[in-house]
């Protein structure tokens, strides 16, 4: 019987990994002041999140094996999970600089913390390098070592492609709704979010257990990429229609000129008059203009459009899960667990 990991259990692995990373830096005789800086970055940036991506690795390994993990299996899976969290930290530190963000996880963004500034760019590079330090230390003799390295490299590049498309499509200081399209939106969410948040953790679990056949990876991708797209569309929906006390933040997609699912849906069905309203009010840092856009979303019945989309896409995902070929060790339960976590979520 598979066993779900807890955040406490997952967190308990991190100090050993942090020490391994600091030891690696010490091997180059890094001066103490810089070592302390690296330690602080490793304790601020990867920690403090929900760790959903990271915990998906041990959860998936346990579901694939259909039993609780041994200590060694758990350590390996959690280590791979922490590598996805380091990847996420690398992206977030960089994104926050690019977006001029103010806070992250309830604290000032890393680049806004005292004395950090643009040194954060180098810190982001070091967080990425940490992945490969840990891979070499703990997986050098693993049969899938090469595939694990390639998985991280490829997923990193895919995410950077999504980020590039996002930055060029929706700059905060230049509102041009002609840039937006559902095709661009789909590219952004698939590459910027779905690959590293949904596909990568399961691919890592399959590699850990030497079950990463081309067929298994393809089946996983065919389910997890649409699932990741659904997750992001849900996020966009909650940004406008969710309750701030549920989602833990006040939605800012309208003011931030985000190429979101809702604005693309609005553009697809708006009359010329309604489009003019969008062009005059979208992407402006103004409460009244935001209210005008929100009212337009209501007038266009976007909430119902989302609910119809949700039922359709979840039906398609369930059908794909039901058709999974389990002969090479893949398990339907892995995907059912992902879907159960996000279907009808309110935060």
From Swiss-Prot:
Protein family according to the UniProt entry: Belongs to the FPP/GGPP synthase family.
Q: What is its main location?
A: cytoplasm
Q: Which organism is it from?
A: Fusarium fujikuroi
Enzyme class per UniProt:
transferase
**Which residues carry the site feature described as Important for determining product chain length?**
90-91
GO molecular function per UniProt:
(2E,6E)-farnesyl diphosphate synthase activity; dimethylallyltranstransferase activity; metal ion binding
EC number annotated for this UniProt entry: 2.5.1.10, 2.5.1.1
Determine the domain of life of the protein's source: Eukaryota
Job of this protein: Catalyzes the sequential condensation of isopentenyl pyrophosphate with the allylic pyrophosphates, dimethylallyl pyrophosphate, and then with the resultant geranylpyrophosphate to the ultimate product farnesyl pyrophosphate.
GO CC annotation, single:
cytoplasm
Residues annotated as binding isopentenyl diphosphate: 50, 53, 88, 105
From the Swiss-Prot or TrEMBL record, give the protein name: Farnesyl pyrophosphate synthase
Compartmental location: Cytoplasm
Residue sites binding Mg(2+) 1 per the record: 95, 99
């Amino acid at each position: 019987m598979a066993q779900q990991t807890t955040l406490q259990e997952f967190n308990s692995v991190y100090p050993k990994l942090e020490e391994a990373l600091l030891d690696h830096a010490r091997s180059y005789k890094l001066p103490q002041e810089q070592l302390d800086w690296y330690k602080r970055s490793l304790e601020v940036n990867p920690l403090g999140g929900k760790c959903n991506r990271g915990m998906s690795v041990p959860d998936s390994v346990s579901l694939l094996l259909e039993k609780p993990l041994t200590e060694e299996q758990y350590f390996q899976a959690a280590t791979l999970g922490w590598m996805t969290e380091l990847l996420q930290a690398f992206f977030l530190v960089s994104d926050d600089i690019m977006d001029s963000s103010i806070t992250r996880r309830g604290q000032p963004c890393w680049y806004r913390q005292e004395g950090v500034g643009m040194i954060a760019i180098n810190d982001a590079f070091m967080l990425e390098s940490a992945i490969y330090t840990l891979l070499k230390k703990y997986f050098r003799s693993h049969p899938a070592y090469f595939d694990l390295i390639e998985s991280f490299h490829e997923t990193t590049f895919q995410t950077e492609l999504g980020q590039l498309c996002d930055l060029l499509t929706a700059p905060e200081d230049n509102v041009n709704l002609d840039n937006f399209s559902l095709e661009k939106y789909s590219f952004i969410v698939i590459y910027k979010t779905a690959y590293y948040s949904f596909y990568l953790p399961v691919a890592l679990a399959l590699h850990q257990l030497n079950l990463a056949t081309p067929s298994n990876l393809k089946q996983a991708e065919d389910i997890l990429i649409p699932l990741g797209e659904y997750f992001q569309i849900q996020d966009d929906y909650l940004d406008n229609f969710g309750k701030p006390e549920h989602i833990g933040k006040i939605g800012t997609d309208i003011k931030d000129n985000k190429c979101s699912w809702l604005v693309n849906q609005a553009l697809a069905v708006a009359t010329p008059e309604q489009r003019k309203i969008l062009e005059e009010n979208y992407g402006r840092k103004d409460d009244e203009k935001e209210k005008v856009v929100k009212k337009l979303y209501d007038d266009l019945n976007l909430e119902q459009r989302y609910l119809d989309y949700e039922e359709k896409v979840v039906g398609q995902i369930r059908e794909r899960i039901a058709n999974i070929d389990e002969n090479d060790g893949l398990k339907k339960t892995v995907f059912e667990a992902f879907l159960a976590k996000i279907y009808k979520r309110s935060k």
